[in-house]
């Protein structure tokens, strides 16, 4: 079995309101990474993560499930947490182990209570977050309404990709940072004219955010100079690490649309264990902070135990 260096690991919790597609997203991530060879469905009881008899019967997640996806030489450990408030402890456990979280919400045009709870828990636990707006091509979906509803309450949220829609279906996306558009196969296409205003608006917000992370970048921003790709990446990493930026992307987990691009963002932007926030621990009776250090003595954190009745 391949051993991954710390900077090639992402521990990611999938959290959010119940029924928004977290388990379907986990399934799609594993399928795209070829961890599994069949895209299972929650509705027919064939999903990998919902394996308990009660979960299959009720078509909901009841307990925290673990999976992984090896993508671009990076191991993404997936912690799929249930969304029902009755099982909130499972989500808290996932956030204790995760270095980042994907908050999954449907494109209903509004913000759900579960989305608010998930984002607030990430802030409380100091876990870097990314939002995945799911089911954008479902009937009567409203991606932009959903994005703006979340942005109105959480100023740190800015879309970094926008879905291209045709006939109510997602056919591609626009990268807000580069103003380049791509179809679902990754081929570059023209940015639709009716999306240009939104792209420019969000690009401006992102550039301003990046400028705020460094004095030299701020001066460059005020002088009207463009940032280099390296400066953009550095600024985004700093903003995410400082919990002042929550990227927002879109897709459809059930059909795997936008899932590879989501995994690209997890690899490129979200923290590996050494870059994540340190956790509090008791050492020799005193409270201290512990970070990840491959050269340090072994240290483990237990987040879940299971009693096997057999």
Descriptions of predicted regions:
Residues 1-310:
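Structural and coupling elements of P-loop NTPases
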């Amino acid at each position: 079995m391949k051993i991954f260096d710390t900077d090639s690991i992402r521990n990611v919790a999938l959290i959010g309101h119940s029924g928004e597609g977290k388990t379907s997203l986990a399934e799609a991530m594993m399928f795209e990474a070829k961890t599994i060879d069949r895209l299972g469905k929650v509705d027919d009881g064939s999903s990998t993560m919902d394996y308990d008899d009660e979960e299959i019967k009720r078509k909901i997640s009841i307990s925290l499930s673990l999976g992984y996806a090896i993508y671009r030489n990076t191991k993404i450990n997936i912690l799929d947490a249930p969304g029902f408030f009755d099982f909130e402890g499972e989500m808290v456990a996932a956030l204790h182990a995760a270095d980042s979280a994907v908050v999954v919400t449907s494109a209903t045009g509004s913000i759900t209570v579960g989305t608010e709870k998930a984002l607030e828990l990430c802030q409380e636990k100091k876990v870097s977050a990314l939002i995945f707006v799911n089911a954008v091509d479902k009937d009567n979906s409203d991606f932009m309404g959903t994005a703006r509803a979340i942005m109105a309450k959480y100023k740190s949220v800015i879309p970094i990709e926008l879905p291209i829609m045709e006939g109510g279906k997602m056919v591609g996306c626009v990268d807000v940072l580069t103003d380049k558009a791509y179809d679902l196969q990754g081929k570059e296409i023209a940015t639709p004219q009716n999306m240009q205003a939104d792209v420019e608006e969000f690009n401006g917000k992102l550039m301003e955010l990046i400028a705020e992370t460094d004095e030299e970048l701020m001066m460059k921003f005020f002088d009207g100079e463009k940032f280099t790709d390296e400066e953009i990446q550095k600024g985004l990493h700093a903003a995410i690490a400082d919990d002042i930026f929550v990227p927002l992307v879109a897709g459809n987990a059930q059909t795997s649309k936008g899932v590879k691009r989501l995994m690209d963002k997890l690899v490129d932007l979200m923290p590996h264990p050494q870059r994540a926030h340190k956790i509090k621990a008791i050492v020799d009776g005193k409270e201290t902070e512990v970070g990840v250090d491959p050269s340090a003595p072994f240290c483990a954190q237990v987040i879940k135990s299971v009693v096997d009745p057999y």
